Amino acid sequence: MRLSPIPLALAAALCLTPAWAQPGPASPTPSPRATPAGQVLTLEQALATAYKRSPLLAAARNEAASSEGQLTQAGVIPNPSIEVGIDDNRRTTRTTTTTLSMPVELGGKRAARVKAAGLARDIAQRDLSSARADLRAAVIAAFFDVAVAQETVRVSQGAVEIAQNALRLAERRVAAGKAPPLESSKARVELANSRIEARAADSALQAARRKLGQLWGAPQPDFAQVGADLDTLPRREAIDDLRAALATSPRMEAGRLSVEMGRAQLEVEKSKRYPDITLSAGVARDNEQGRNKAQFGVAIPLPLFDRNQGNVYSATMQSYKAQDMYRELESRLTADLLQSVSQFDLAANSAREYRATVLPGAAEAYDSARKGFEAGKVSFLEVLDAQRTLSQGNIGYLNVLASAYQASADIDRILGR
């Protein structure tokens, strides 16, 4: 795992001279907590595990598979029926009739059903792609949440060390009679606050680890830590390229297919206006006359009252609704995409500003304040203020870093990548 600039800022503060202010090699960073090498989780491993074990993705796969069965069922023809009737219970005068009847669908019902079922299958496939993209985005966001939380723990531990050093300096000055006891009291309060923040950071890390593990159905995290490169910010494409990618995203394709599905369902209902006929053929055995009689027939329902007019109207309105929903989907996804792009740009630019100005300046200010305090040139209050500025800068950098990765994951989710 590559190290971010945060531990460098802490190391610079602890080593009295900021790393950004000298041309030599960077100061050594604090070592991460000991973890078995086999337990370090990479992003590729997290994605592969989620694709394999996610209950939600498995449910989406089953939903897509079920649509194949619906397509098969839509193409079958009605079953024939056989009817046997006996007239008269006396054998000598009995007539036994056996009839085979076959329904015949008219009006293109079967073709309309097959088309609608095919569109439903295509929509299910796009929904599966969207579910996979949602899972990928969630894993990436949760993965970097863990990575940032790990870094936050290291930063908070470094802040505790800084507060401990400040307390030792204050106690030495108080013991030497160079400062009032109030300074050591303030230093103890600052150390207590740093420890509280460190415990909160550790709790946030455990919550982030659980959230990541839950994405593949693990009630407890089955990894110790993640390995992520926090030095490299994700990149985004140009707006025009993102808009073009949105137009072909699974959600937009599913929306267009839903419009076609609405029209196909309307055709299904229209086809039901034409009644199906039933053809029959059979034989009647007349025992009294000792001969067989062939029988043929056709049954035609008369559409005098029920012409499926209500369902046709309902399907028409549903078709209009699908068109309206598609327009709403296009507008919403475009707005979401632009919002995520704006959030990403803000976070990425802020992260660069933190790296270039805030973190080096905060470390240098703390170093100068501590040296001045040791020399008796500045007050302890100024040291505490510089210490808080350094800590807030570190935490602020991690927050914008997490926002950048979250916004990047949101962009990928919207585009269905």
Predicted regions located by residue number:
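Bacterial N-terminal signal peptides
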Residues: P7-P18
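Bacterial Sec-pathway N-terminal export signals of envelope proteins
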Residues: A21-D87, R94, S101-V104, A112, ...
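Periplasmic alpha-helical coiled-coil/stalk elements that build and connect Gram-negative outer-membrane
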Residues: Q22, A131-A244, T248, S340, ...
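Small/polar-residue-enriched beta-strand and adjacent coil segments characteristic
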Residues: V40-L43, P80-A131, E253-E330, S340-Q343, ...
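Amphipathic alpha-helical coiled-coil segments
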Residues: A59-L71, A131, L135-S156, N165-R168, ...
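Short, charged, amphipathic alpha-helical segments
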Residues: V114-G118, P181-V189, F380-Q387
